[in-house]
Amino acid sequence: MRSRTIEAYKTTLRLTDVQREIVVGVLLGDAHLETQNGGRSYRLKVEQGHRHAEYVRHLYSELREWVLTPPKQKMGKTKGVITLNLAFQTVSHEELASYGSLFYRARRKVVPEQIREIATARTLAYWYMDDGSMKSRQSKGVIFNTQAYDSSDIRRLIDVLEGFGLEAWERRQSDGIQIYVSGSSYEQFAELVGPYVIEAMRYKVPLTRRTQLPKR
């Protein structure tokens, strides 16, 4: 599209309630916002390893009217290892500026103070698909990889999980702090996020865990 056409098109864009829940969820995970005009508008950038390509395509589908170019392969680097990723970005838009002010302080991503008020079960599901996993094959425990956040951010996220009735606490690792959701909360966790987890991510919420594994 030409620039005038793009600007005219952008005036028609409004985030739906579902899209807002998804945006909050992926921002809690690996997605990030970028501004090129001092915060007047932002674009959302999504990038995942190629093994999560179906998840990236799903996010693209959910946000399609906000994206001018379909997901593309790109090279990335994780802990010094070159990776093949799939990525896309939205148009830069004023409606995303509110999320920029919520999620960023001095260019560092933070957890909004009001996250408990804006997080929903769908938000939790997208955060988990984006940046969570089962603790192990021998446990019902769930891990959120929150190592990039500081202790106050992690406390807010634990408050969110506890607000959903889940038992959660900090789990210190060499590279930072993860959040651990107790196996005793697994059934409730699975019921919360299950309706929103896409087929390609079902392995993260295995049904067999509900009856066959101890609640560690």
Where are these regions (language model features)?
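Internal intein/HINT superfamily modules and their associated LAGLIDADG
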Residues: 1-216
